[in-house]
Amino acid sequence: VSSTPSQHLTQLQHYADDLQQRRTNRRQLLKAAGAGAGIAALGALPAELSASPGSPIGAADVVLAQGLAAGTALVTSPRLPLPGIGAAQVAPLLQGDYANWHEVGAPLSLPVTLVVLDGYLPEGTSPTSTVGDYEALVDALDEDAGAFAMLPIELIDCRVNTLDIDGVNPLIAAATEDAPAVRLGIAGDVIFGRNGGNRQRDFGDYSMPMYQVKDFMASFDVTVSNFECFVSETIDLATVDNLDFVTIPDSLKGLVLAGFDAVTMANNHAVFSYAGYGIPGMQDTMMHLNEAGITPFGVGMDLDEARVPWVTEVNGVSIAFYGVDGVTANLDYPDSAGVQNMGDNPSAATASQGGTNPLKMDQCLADIEELVGQYDIVLPYFHMGEQYVWTPMQWVVDVSRQCIDAGATAVLTAHPHATMGMEIYRGKPIYYSIGNFVYDQMFTLETREGYFLEMTFVGKDLKGFRIHPVDILDFFQPRFMSGLQSAGYNDRFWRSVDLTRKTRGWDRELTRP
């Protein structure tokens, strides 16, 4: 445990340097493997090393397993909680030797259904059904959680799940120098106040929250979360029954260790507090995050600064994250469910006052449209919605869809402290609540759980996503679920998707690009 600010900064810098070296080494190994021996060499790498940025051999030349034509991959319903299978299982699966997905590793019992897209009939197979175009295939996979198909890799988009083969993601394996792979990792609410911070201090280990997830998270090219907690050496720590969240700079060590690059502070605990920490508390937090090498966005000392996105570049692909506070700075829906009406004292930044980037739709949409013209990937990360419910409010749906109409690549949301589902709108995903990642709400199953979102891009195109369910142990330590626990979470996630469709004006035509 560091005893002085200088020791603290030295330790954080050591963590940051070590992480950067690990990422650099991984990318170099992947590049060498792809150039030297193609996909076979990639398959020989450790799993965490096969996770970016891919082989330069091109989609048409990739041969993943016996039974798969060159340039093709297996895709399933996104509802199937199965990331991949072994190469030796591919041909038997296509030929109907497996009747149930649990036979190839799925954590549940679900009949296998082969759907064939016209022109792509695997040799020696007997499909359950045939569809005429890709849109019909997407519909078939959405309607049947056990359905799968063989597809050319270049046809695949984020509306289907692409199976890894022997730990190799076909989308990444087929990436090229002109269309490189980029993996983004998105976490939900991270809060080190109250019991979470107390547990760190009890153990005397400020990296402990991330020990069970750090290796996987550090494998991503970019990792971002919502961070809502004051970080200060001058503010007194709040008691466990307090709704003000305060921690010390040492608490950031775990985020650095796990590879967090940036965090949105556009939320209801960046400026507002019952004790009145206000702008000085926000400044402390921003300072300590920046010192740790984690860039805060969605806040600033005036409105212009609060509207500035966090921008990064990976393999030549530019990415902009844009934070918006729809809870304590909601100027367009001040009286709606899930909004703290701040009256004459909002947290919103203005031309002359610091604060969070407010939810003011004409301003937000103009910003998104401008960012779309400048960057390849644009991801608004909202803090909004009613807490502890399964489905989004209608105003949240309206806000999210307008952002997609403005050109956003996807929409991310935190704040409800319970997982909600997602929807595909105009071919792009909206994630209505990613849920808790580090928070001391042990009182319900929903608040103890969340997910880590994996997004795989090829160039600027989102080709796939996966949700990795997490549960929170002992008030402060996330771990990834597995087996039946993961299957149960997956079931609740998709039930929320279906309930949202029934209650929020869903139509299948709205899903089309």
Where are these regions (language model features)?
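N-terminal secretory signal peptides
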Residues: 1-28, 35-42, 47-50
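C-terminal segment of N-terminal export signals and the immediately downstream linker at the start
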Residues: 23, 44-69
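Flexible loop/hinge segments at secondary-structure junctions
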Residues: 62-177
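Binuclear metal-dependent hydrolase catalytic cores centered on His/Asp/Glu-rich metal-binding motifs
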Residues: 197-211, 245-246, 313-378, 484
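A short C-terminal boundary segment appended to hydrolase-like catalytic domains
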Residues: 198, 446-513
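Short acidic, glycine-rich surface-loop motifs adjacent to enzyme active sites
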Residues: 220-232, 263-270, 368-391
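Active-site-proximal segments of metal-dependent phosphoesterases and phosphodiesterases across multiple
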Residues: 235-256, 376-407
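Conserved beta-sheet core of the metallophosphoesterase superfamily
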Residues: 259-262, 392-451
